[in-house]
């Protein structure tokens, strides 16, 4: 892998939803990320403002890029958003994610979504969880592993090798 590319870049390349919505990865490294997205006609609701789900998706994408910039596969454990003001068709939104803290396999990240000119649209906070690789079947389980679902059972993402 190119040394300037992180695991987040690899993840983003495979992110069909974000790419189809026109989200652009601006940067991702060392627990931070920047992503941008234009608000198109197909993203506005009945009030003719950007649907909050699209704003959330942009923030969530920046969050995912920031927490995956360290390497091991990391997923959202929870997230919430506060909408400060509406975005409109034609706006270009920038989401800036920053790591607040990491502890064990968990982390907290803040994302500010703003218009290109800097006006804040929304504030997002995400909680992350780094996944553990599945244990090899030919070794003794670690303490507590016996309580996990068997390979291929509930809790396993098919084809990922992670729980």
Locations of the language-model features?
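Hydrophobic beta-strand-centered segment that forms part of the acyl-chain substrate-binding groove
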Residues: 64-94, 99
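Hydrophobic residues in beta-strands and at strand termini
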Residues: 37-39, 83, 130
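HotDog/MaoC-like acyl-thioester-processing domains
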Residues: 1-2, 70, 87-89, 98-163
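Short, charged/polar surface micro-motifs in flexible loops or helix N-caps
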Residues: 30-31, 39-43, 62-63, 89
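A generic structural signal for short beta-strands and their flanking turns/coil linkers
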Residues: 19-21, 31-33, 52, 73-79, ...
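Compact, glycine-rich, soluble single-domain proteins
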Residues: 45-64
């Amino acid at each position: 892998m190119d040394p300037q590319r992180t695991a987040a870049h690899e993840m983003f390349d495979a992110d069909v939803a974000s790419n189809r919505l026109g989200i652009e990865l601006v940067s991702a490294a060392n627990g931070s990320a920047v992503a941008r997205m234009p608000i198109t006609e197909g993203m506005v609701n009945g009030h003719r403002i950007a649907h909050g789900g699209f704003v959330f998706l942009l923030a969530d994408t920046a969050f995912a890029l920031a927490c995956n910039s360290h390497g091991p596969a990391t997923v959202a454990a929870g997230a919430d958003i506060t909408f400060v003001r509406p975005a409109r068709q034609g706006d270009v939104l920038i989401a800036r994610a920053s790591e607040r803290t990491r502890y064990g396999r968990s982390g907290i990240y803040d994302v500010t979504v703003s218009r290109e000119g800097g006006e804040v649209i929304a504030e997002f906070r995400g909680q992350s969880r780094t996944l553990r690789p599945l244990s090899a079947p030919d070794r003794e389980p670690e303490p507590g592993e016996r309580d996990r679902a068997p390979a291929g059972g509930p809790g396993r993402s098919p084809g990922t090798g992670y729980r």
